[in-house]
Design a protein with these regions (language model features):
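Glycine-rich phosphate-binding loops that contact phosphosugars or nucleotide phosphates
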Residues: 33-164
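A short, well-structured juxtamembrane/interface segment
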Residues: 9-28
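Short secondary-structure boundary micro-motifs
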Residues: 7-8, 15-16, 33, 70
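Residue-level detector of alpha-helical secondary structure
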Residues: 5, 20-24, 42-49
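Helix-enriched interaction subdomains in cytosolic or periplasmic regions
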Residues: 1-10
């Protein structure tokens, strides 16, 4: 991981956005956090921290049995949409994380949430990634200006941990 890149990306985070994130998270009772790979690990970690430290109903989609069932029955591209459909309530906040911003299942989840659920999106790599195109339809959007997975994932976790 390039430490200079990490420092630069940390400095790019706006304090006002972290304050807005805190306000949004504290105003919600149920929060679903979704990601793939390393972002899924972040989702699981943050969901349990929001439950333990903040008393929120934090959910991630990381149970292997349920995840593979949904992927088999609905296809990987729609599995997360179905998870949201089955577990979200009208006022549920959905946080979508994709380092590249181009994971079809995460992008499809953003499309699904439009007009149904409030969402926060976190992405990286190319600013014109597919997920970032939903930033105007989300309550808040964080884009990390790096093409390194380690940097993007670290910044995403720092952002989501910032209100703890």
């Amino acid at each position: 991981m390039n430490i200079d890149d990490l420092k630069r990306c940390l400095n790019d985070i706006k304090y006002e956005d972290l304050e807005k994130l805190k306000e949004i998270i504290l105003s919600k009772d149920k929060i679903i956090i979704l990601g793939n790979g390393g972002s899924n690990a972040i989702s699981s970690h943050i969901a349990q921290d929001y439950t333990k430290a903040l008393g929120k109903k934090g959910l991630s989609f990381s149970d292997a049995s349920r995840l593979t069932c949904y992927m088999n029955d609905y296809g990987i591209e729609k599995a997360y949409c179905k998870f949201i459909e089955h577990f979200a309530e009208p006022d549920t906040l959905v946080i979508l994380i994709s380092s590249s911003g181009n994971s079809d299942n995460i992008v499809n989840s953003a499309e699904y949430c439009v007009d149904k659920h409030d969402m926060i999106i976190l992405s990286g790599f190319d600013k014109n990634n597919k997920l970032n195109s939903y930033s105007d339809k989300s309550l808040l959007s964080f884009w990390v200006d790096s093409k390194e997975y380690g940097v993007v994932e670290s910044i995403h976790e720092i952002i989501l941990h910032s209100l703890m």
